[in-house]
Design a protein with these regions (language model features):
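Domain-level recognition of nuclease-like catalytic cores that cleave nucleotide substrates
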Residues: 176-190
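Accessory nucleic acid-recognition modules appended to NTPase machines
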Residues: 1-138
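Short active-site-adjacent structural elements
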Residues: 128, 147-150, 179-183
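Short, hydrophobic beta-strand segments that form beta-sheet elements in well-ordered domains
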Residues: 121-122, 168-174
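Short, charged, amphipathic alpha-helix that recurs within catalytic cores of restriction-modification
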Residues: 151-164
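Short beta-strand-loop-alpha-helix junction that forms the active-site gateway
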Residues: 135, 141-150
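Hydrophobic/aromatic beta-strand patches that form the interior of the parallel beta-sheet core
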Residues: 84, 139, 171-173, 189
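Hydrophobic, well-ordered secondary-structure elements that form the walls
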Residues: 111, 139, 158, 170
């Protein structure tokens, strides 16, 4: 692998385990410490500093990119990010139930290309998949809203965010559903 040679990586198994663990948690924030513990729990000992190096290598080679939590303090912005794969084909190699993860990853890649470093996720008592401060836009991703519990969770997250942050554009991206959800004074595009 070019990555191994380029950065003289000696612990290639730890890197492979890290990539697998990132794929398995593609929709969740991951701290450096959590990732180091996950990799170490497989018997591949690794330090937090090495995890940081490997993550930087993965981003420098455009295998992955990260998003910061808009709502967190500076230290947490740096150490607790969401990681996405630049190529859904690579991500799909690691997933058992890929639909929602692949859809969210595809949306992340598309938004990252369009908005660059202005793209965040939002997590403070509410979890919203994507947040754009400049456009006051919040986006949730769900494979489908046909399940009433899923629909309620996704809609409520956006409405709660709109109560706490200036958001003009609320959107839920699904695989193939389209509608307008009106809740009070807020409209959510699906």
């Amino acid at each position: 692998c070019d990555l191994l040679a380029r950065y003289s990586i000696r612990n290639d198994m730890a890197l492979k385990v890290l990539i697998r663990k990132l794929a398995e948690s593609v929709k969740q924030p991951s701290s450096f410490t959590r990732l180091a513990n996950l990799v170490s729990s497989t018997g591949k000992k690794i330090t937090t500093d090495t995890i940081i190096d490997y993550l930087n290598y993965l981003e420098d080679t455009w295998i992955m990119f990260s998003l910061e939590n808009y709502a967190s303090k500076l230290a947490d912005k740096v150490s607790n990010k969401k990681y996405y794969f630049m190529d859904n084909g690579i991500l799909s190699l690691f997933l058992m139930d890929p639909e929602t993860s692949l859809l969210e990853n595809l949306v992340a890649v598309t938004l990252k290309k369009r908005y660059g470093d202005d793209l965040y996720f939002y997590h403070r008592n509410i979890e919203v998949d994507f947040y754009l401060d400049e456009g006051h836009k919040a986006i949730q991703v769900s494979y489908s809203l046909k399940d009433p519990e899923t629909r309620k969770r996704e809609v409520n997250a956006l409405l709660k965010l709109a109560e706490n942050v200036a958001v003009d554009d609320l959107c839920i991206i699904t695989r193939d559903e389209e509608e307008m959800i009106v809740e009070g004074e807020k409209t959510i595009r699906v």
